[in-house]
Amino acid sequence: MTTKPHNPANVLLQDAKTGKLPESEGTLVLKEVIKNSAVMQLAKFEDMGGKPVKKFTFLAKGPGAYWVSEAERIQTSKMEWKQATMETKKLGVIIPFSKEFLKYSVQDFMQMAAPLIAEAFYRAFDQAVLFGTESPWGEDKSIFKIAEAKQKVITEGTGKNLYHDMVSLLALVEADEHDPNGLLTSRAFKSKMRNVVDNNGYPMFDPNSNQILTLPISYASKQIIDKEKALALIGDWDYARYGVLQDIEYAVSTDAQLSTIEGADGKPVNLFEQDMFAL
C-alpha cells in the first residue's frame, strides 16, 4: 500500500515537520538567491547533472592561424585544455519563528518564509566565495585570497586618483590575457565611483546603464563586502561557475536551543522556553 504525498496547500506545517519545499516556493527561493547574489549575477551557471561532483574540460587557449606560402608546411596549432572540478556542499540556514506559524499551511508558510531563506542563502554563499567566510572549501580558495596570493591587488591611492587605480586594476586582469567583464562592490562605493573621471574630465560611471569603464556592476550588501579587505573586485567572471545539486529540504524543531542565534537578552534562543520553533 502506498501513501500519497501530501498537498502542501492543505497540510499544516505542524503536521508536516520535515519534507521538501513545495516546487513553486523552492523555485522562488532559488530565483531570489540568483537575483540577489552579487557573485551569481556575474558568474555562469553550471548544470551539475544531479551529481555532487562534476568535472568538465574548458578551453584555456584556442587554436592559432598561420600565414603560409605555396608548398610550405602548415604549422600544427596547439590548443590548451584544462579540467575543472566542481564539488557541492550542503548550505543550511536556521530561522526562528513564533509557534503561531505552525498553524499555517506548508505552502502559505513557505511563501512567507521564502525571502528570509533566500537572503540567508545568498549572503552565506557570497561571503564564502568572496572572502572565505565559514567556507567549507577553506579561506584560501576565496576570490580575495587567491587575488592576494597572486599579487593581483591595487591599494586605493596608489595612482593619481581612483580612475588611475581602476585602470591599473584592469591591467592586472589583462596581464594574464583575460578580458575584465564585471565589477563587484558595495553600494557605499557608489559615491566614489561618481567622482571617477578620465584624463579629459569625462565621468566614467554611468548610473543609467549601471556601468563603470564599460564594466557592468554587481552590488553586494553591506554584510557581505569586507571593506577592510577589498572595496571592489574586477575580473573575467566567465571563469566563475556555480551549480545547484537538488531541491531544498526543511525540518521543523520545537525543543532545541539555538547556540548560534541570540535573543534580546544576549543569550542563546531556547525554543521551548520562548514558545518558538526553528525552521
Q: What name fits each language-model region?
A:
Residues I117, M276-L279:
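Active-site scaffold segments
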Residues P63-W67, S105, K192-N195, Y242:
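Short helix/loop capping segments that flank catalytic or ligand/cofactor-binding pockets
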Residues K55-F56, I95, I217, L279:
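Bulky hydrophobic/aromatic "packing anchor" residues in well-ordered structure
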Residues K82-T85, G92-L172:
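Alpha-helical scaffold segments that mediate packing/assembly in large oligomeric complexes
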Residues T3, L13-V93, L162:
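Assembly/oligomerization interface modules of large self-assembling protein complexes
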Residues K20, S24-I34, A38, F109-A113, ...:
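Short, Φ-rich (hydrophobic/aromatic) sequence segments
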Residues A9:
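Active-site-surrounding "flap" and adjacent substrate/cofactor-binding loops of secreted or lumenal enzymes
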Residues K152-F277:
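Extended oligomerization regions of viral-like shell subunits
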